[in-house]
């Protein structure tokens, strides 16, 4: 972790013209509790520059700073490293010409990389005509060196965690405005990389997200469009390649359209159930989803006090809702949740499992004993034990890999990231807090007596301080160190 070789937090393209995005984005979405419960009916709003700006800012925008070298984004990220970039494939967005754009969060603008309608080519790569017929697609890419600089090979997992967490925000904002969205995790990797002008190794595609309802008539057949010609800025003085990261990423790649079709049609038997909607808590208030996103920040200190029941039951229900992704069959999830409950009103301390419904007690234990266990499972980080409860999102990897092949591991990590992002938003909706934590992989499985492997750990509880909300586009809140 050489400070002189630290990766740049933002990618730019030299010479690319920048289109400023609207900065006046008052919170106008539905109440956060209703949104996170999936209770906002779709209204299919017209996508214009303001709605696009809203989607980008509240998922990947800069909301806080601490000096000129430390930036915080709207979504959580392991180590605050944010190994992701977002590209916009614009077809029918009011006020923007069709083309390929790159989101530059530090200036809150779109870099215009290539003109023309790239949706047909993206639809070809995803083997999905709805991509060509949707007004907008956002493509999320991962830059493993940005997180491997600190976490080495383990950082590859962080790319998919962080993508899920970021898209939890995007899904919430879209739902809060009645905008239909769908995530594609199946695509020809090399074709999407080529369209974006990235090499597929130091930067690779992670997810394709269509926004808006597809029109009845799809765009034209793919035509050969020139790739972006603007060179990217260097990521760091001497980026380091990790051979294991490259091998793991390439092991899950799909190389043909037939591969994508077959992978997407894979049947995985016995997946847990997931619902699309849950009941919203009555006392949660009417705070818009955007305001909650601005208040959210990784909680650094928690009080060991009794938490209200809805912080466990509603927050976990909201977090485990169906994810609208091609790889996850409707009404199912790849995850189970092993939950260490410490202090929640009406819930006995102990180890619980949440799968196919509310959490079920597996092993009761004294509060202090559970707190000590949770802290140990989280590499002795105090927040793991100071929380009201700590959720360990797990996946049966034998089941996942049998059905999805090597690419299935990406899907499980991604879905865990979505659940983690939703869980934190739900906690902040109720006026509480949460944070992601590192964990000891095998120890989690052993402690809960499960064959499933831990994908991600999230501590949820009562903050010991009042967090300061982030600022609007172009005016991030400045924090003191």
Residue map of PLM features:
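Short surface loop/edge beta-strand patches of beta-sandwich-type extracellular domains
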Residues: 427
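N-terminal accessory segments that position/regulate proteins before the catalytic core
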Residues: 1-422, 430-481
């Amino acid at each position: 972790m050489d400070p002189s070789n630290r990766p740049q937090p933002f990618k730019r393209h030299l010479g690319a013209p920048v289109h400023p995005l609207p900065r006046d984005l008052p919170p106008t979405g539905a109440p956060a509790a209703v949104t996170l419960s999936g209770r906002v009916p779709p209204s299919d709003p017209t996508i214009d520059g303001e709605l696009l700006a809203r989607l980008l800012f509240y998922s990947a925008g800069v909301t806080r700073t601490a000096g000129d070298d430390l930036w915080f984004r709207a979504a959580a990220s392991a180590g605050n490293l944010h190994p992701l970039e977002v590209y916009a494939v614009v077809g029918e967005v009011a006020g923007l010409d069709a083309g390929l754009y790159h989101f530059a969060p530090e200036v809150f603008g779109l870099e215009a990389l290539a003109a023309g309608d790239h949706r047909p080519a993206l639809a070809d790569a995803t083997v999905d005509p709805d991509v060509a017929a949707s007004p907008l697609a956002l493509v999320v890419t991962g830059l493993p060196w940005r997180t491997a600089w600190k976490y080495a090979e383990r950082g590859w997992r962080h790319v998919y965690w962080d993508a899920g967490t970021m898209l939890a925000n995007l899904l919430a904002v879209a739902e809060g405005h009645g905008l239909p969205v769908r995530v594609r995790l199946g695509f020809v990797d090399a074709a999407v990389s080529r369209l974006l002008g990235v090499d597929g190794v130091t930067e690779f595609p992670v997810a394709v997200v269509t926004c808006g309802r597809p029109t009845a008539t799809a765009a034209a057949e793919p035509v050969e469009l020139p790739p972006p010609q603007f060179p990217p800025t260097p990521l760091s003085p001497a980026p380091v390649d990790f051979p294991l990261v490259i091998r793991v990423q390439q092991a899950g790649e799909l190389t043909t359209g037939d591969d994508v079709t077959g992978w997407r049609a894979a049947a995985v038997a016995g997946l847990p159930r997931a619902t699309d909607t849950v009941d919203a808590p009555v006392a949660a208030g009417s705070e818009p989803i955007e305001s909650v996103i601005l208040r959210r920040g990784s909680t650094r200190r928690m009080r060991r006090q009794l938490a209200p029941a809805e912080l466990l039951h509603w927050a976990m229900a909201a977090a485990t809702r169906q994810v609208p992704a091609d790889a996850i069959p409707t009404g199912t999830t790849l995850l189970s949740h092993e939950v260490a409950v410490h202090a929640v009103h009406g819930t006995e301390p102990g180890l619980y499992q949440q799968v196919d419904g509310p959490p079920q007690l597996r092993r009761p234990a004294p509060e202090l004993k559970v707190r000590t266990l949770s802290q140990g499972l989280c590499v002795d980080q105090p927040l793991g034990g100071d929380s009201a409860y700590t959720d360990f999102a797990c996946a049966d990897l034998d089941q996942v890999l049998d059905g999805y092949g090597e690419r299935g591991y990406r899907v499980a990590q991604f879905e865990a990231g979505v659940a983690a992002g939703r869980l934190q938003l739900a906690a902040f909706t109720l006026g509480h807090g949460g944070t992601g934590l590192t964990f000891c992989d095998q120890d989690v499985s052993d402690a809960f007596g499960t064959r499933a492997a831990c994908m991600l750990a999230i501590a949820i509880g009562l903050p010991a301080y009042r967090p300061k909300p982030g600022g609007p586009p172009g005016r991030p809140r400045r924090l003191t160190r």
